[in-house]
């Protein structure tokens, strides 16, 4: 995608009050990344780079010779444990989340956290994450007393002929989702104690899956474990931001037009970083 969603996320994060950006990349990409990406942020924000590699495992574990796939999104978070010292948000670099999403999570992270396991996530309204060009997969959330109760990955969410949002459940029955149903788009808020929990859960993951070449340690699965054990609560934050990206090639013209509109109406300057 020629549109750099990452640049918009960095810009929006700065506007929301975040003061440092930590990028998780492959070591072999470092030189190009510093020249082509980090250079544009100089003078605008404090940036750091950490490296995710398949050999970055806890003491006592050795990466299998046939492993080529990264260990997953929650393993990527663990790469920042020696760099991050305060509350932090986690995003997908190639997603566009919108200004309001960063505003609400920055507000939540800036309050006092006086206990471990006090986390948050932005719950996007599923109707604001859809495409007209096919189906999508989303982590559909149930919320209890303002906190995350469950998150279930639903595949093939789409519009039906009446433009209702539907998916087929595990029993083969078509179910309808209300447009304001919260879904996770991997915009999470944590405090540094999450590294401790993640390290423990990653070791458990490796004990079961280290010899499975395509197994991955995902953020939602780790969070779900902590919620079910009572070690964490995850406040679900509402946003009216519209997530968008190029899920299908047919999405591209609409996304390009939307970015042009956001520049034209003054949401973003002509150049984000100059």
Residue ranges and their predicted role:
Residues 54-59, 127-129, 157-159, 242-244:
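A short acidic, often aromatic-flanked loop/helix-cap motif at beta-alpha or helix-coil junctions
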Residues 99-188:
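Conserved core of the sugar-phosphate nucleotidyltransferase
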Residues 18, 85, 116-117, 231-232:
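Short, high-confidence coil segments that cap the C-terminus of an alpha-helix
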Residues 4-92, 97-104, 111:
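Conserved N-terminal catalytic core of the sugar/cofactor nucleotidyltransferase
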Residues 144-145, 151, 159-274:
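Conserved alpha/beta core of the MobA/IspD/sugar-nucleotide pyrophosphorylase nucleotidyltransferase superfamily
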Residues 47-49, 119-121, 234-236, 243:
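Conserved beta-strand scaffold positions in the cores of enzyme catalytic domains, especially
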């Amino acid at each position: 995608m020629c549109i750099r969603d990452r640049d918009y996320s960095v810009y929006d994060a700065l506007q929301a009050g975040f003061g440092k950006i930590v990028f998780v990349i492959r070591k072999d990409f470092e030189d190009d990344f510093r020249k082509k990406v980090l250079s544009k942020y100089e003078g605008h924000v404090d940036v750091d780079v950490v490296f995710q590699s398949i050999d970055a495992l806890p003491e006592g574990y050795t990466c299998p010779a046939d492993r080529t796939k990264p260990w997953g999104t929650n393993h990527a978070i663990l790469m920042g444990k020696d760099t991050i010292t305060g509350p932090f948000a986690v995003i997908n670099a190639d997603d566009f989340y919108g200004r309001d999403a960063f505003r609400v999570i920055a507000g939540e992270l800036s309050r006092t956290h006086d206990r471990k396991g006090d986390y948050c996530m932005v719950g996007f309204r599923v109707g604001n994450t859809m495409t007209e060009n096919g189906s999508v997969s989303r982590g559909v959330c149930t919320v209890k007393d303002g906190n995350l109760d469950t998150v279930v990955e639903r595949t093939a969410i789409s519009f039906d002929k009446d433009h209702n949002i539907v998916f087929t459940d595990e029993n083969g029955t078509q179910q309808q989702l209300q447009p304001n149903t919260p879904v996770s788009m991997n915009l999470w808020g944590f405090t540094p104690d999450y590294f401790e929990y993640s390290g423990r859960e990653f070791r458990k993951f490796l004990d079961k899956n280290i010899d499975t070449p395509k197994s991955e340690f995902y953020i939602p699965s780790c969070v779900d474990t902590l919620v079910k054990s009572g070690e964490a609560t995850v406040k679900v934050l509402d946003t009216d931001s519209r997530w968008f990206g190029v899920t299908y090639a047919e999405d591209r013209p609409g996304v390009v037009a939307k970015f042009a509109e956001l520049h034209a109406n003054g949401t973003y300057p002509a150049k984000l970083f100059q």
